[in-house]
Design a protein with these regions (language model features):
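Conserved, mostly hydrophobic/aromatic
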Residues: 1, 110, 145, 170, ...
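Conserved alpha-helical substructure of the radical SAM core
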Residues: 158-186
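N-terminal pre-triad scaffold of radical SAM enzymes
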Residues: 124-153, 186, 360
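Catalytic cores of alpha/beta
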Residues: 266-267, 331-348
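Glycine-rich beta-alpha loop elements in corrinoid/cobalamin-binding modules
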Residues: 2-88, 95-96, 372-373
Length: 374
């Protein structure tokens, strides 16, 4: 068996080429971004041997060590092959290092394929998929995220190195969108996991990968972090200028701590003036600094500084636009007192949330590891 993990475009091509050349599936053990199983103990001197499944299933300490090793091996530049034994089945699970990030040209090629831009006809009988309305007229401009929130698995799926499409690729897709019969002039979103990440966190990442034991934004922005929204500003200006486009919104996650630390306010100002559809949703997640530390999020004072400036810019531009915070309850490490503080914060805002996010464990996140191990 062979599994492609992460964003598998390059892996799929390499697997197909191997099959076309006559290599049996069982011998395709060399493709990055894949996992395979074998009954023979792999002869891989540089591989990291993880504790066997039987051991991590019964020992939280060994599970913690295994997860940490996996987490440190998610970067394509530094990751090693991981081997996990399954003694009960006489098998070994082998995970090859992740694929290298796609280049801009490769990203453009992926998004230039003739997608139907619709759900499969089989869903018609069930009334379709309502969620498609939100993404049908949206543009995916980037991939990856160096935010590294504890409750998010993006580090495992897309990695911490930002990959972007070219302006022309996005403009061409936008032109295609404007030709859709039900297009009303509104591009709903231009973003990705984090909308305002359009470049790697620093130049080092392109040659050496992301730091293994240091985050880009937490607990404080790294001194090497390059904060620059100029490319995103230029892209949004071009999209706004397209014929048939009335408004271009940014609705996917804006990383407010990255934004508020940009000394150039051009993007912040244009975001408020042109790209908010009545309310801007951001994710402070909590108000207790103790919980935020567990989440890998900035201190609450950073969000308050952002919210204050957002309010000031709206007043300056004579706009009445709301700021809607995403908040999470029950995160590991949260106490009853923390929950009360969160409730009091909502009371102070006079805000009754329509949607509530209560933590639940999901695979491949630090928060789930905390939840399970205590």
């Amino acid at each position: 068996d062979l599994i492609s993990y992460g964003m598998g475009e390059r892996s799929i091509v390499e697997i197909a080429e191997a099959l076309r050349s006559g290599i049996p599936v069982r011998d395709i053990t060399f493709v990055r971004g894949t996992v395979y199983k074998t009954a023979v103990q792999p002869d891989l001197p540089d591989a990291i041997r993880l504790p066997g499944f039987d051991k991590i299933a019964t020992s939280k300490e060994l599970y913690a060590k295994s997860f940490y090793r996996q987490y440190l091996n998610t970067d394509p530049f530094t990751a090693k092959t991981l081997v996990e034994p399954y003694p009960a089945d006489n098998l070994f699970l082998v995970q090859n290092p992740p694929q290298k990030p796609l280049s801009t040209e490769e990203m453009d090629a992926v998004y230039a394929l003739p997608y139907a831009r619709a759900y499969h006809p089989d869903y018609e009988a069930a009334g379709g998929i309502p969620a498609i309305e939100e993404i049908k007229f949206s543009l995916a401009s980037c991939r990856g995220c160096f935010g590294a929130c504890s409750f998010c698995a993006l580090t495992f799926h897309q990695g911490r190195i930002i990959q972007t499409r070219s302006h022309e690729s996005l403009l061409e897709e936008a032109r295609q969108i404007t030709q859709e019969p039900d297009f009303k002039g509104y591009i709903h979103d231009v973003g990705g996991p984090t909308a305002n990440f359009r470049q790697p966190a620093c130049k080092k990442q392109l040659q050496h990968g992301a730091c293994q034991k240091r985050q880009c934004l937490f607990p404080e922005p790294c001194p090497n972090l390059e904060i620059d929204h100029s490319d995103y500003v230029a892209l949004l200006r071009k999209l706004r200028a397209l014929p048939k486009v009335k408004r271009v919104f940014v609705r996917s996650g804006i990383r407010f701590d990255y934004l508020i630390n940009d000394k150039d306010e051009t993007f912040f100002r244009e975001l408020v003036r042109y790209h908010v559809s009545g309310q801007l949703k951001v994710a402070p997640e909590h108000v207790s600094d103790g919980v935020l530390r567990m989440m890998g999020k900035p201190q609450n004072s950073v969000y308050r500084r952002f919210a204050k400036r957002y309010k000031e810019l709206n007043a300056e531009m004579h706009l009445d636009q709301y700021l809607v915070p995403y908040l999470m309850s029950s995160h590991p490490g949260s106490t009853l007192q923390d929950a009360i503080r969160l409730a009091e914060y909502l009371r102070e805002l006079g805000y009754m949330p329509e949607q509530v996010q209560d933590f639940y464990p999901t695979p491949s996140t630090i928060s789930t590891f905390m939840y399970y191990t205590g």
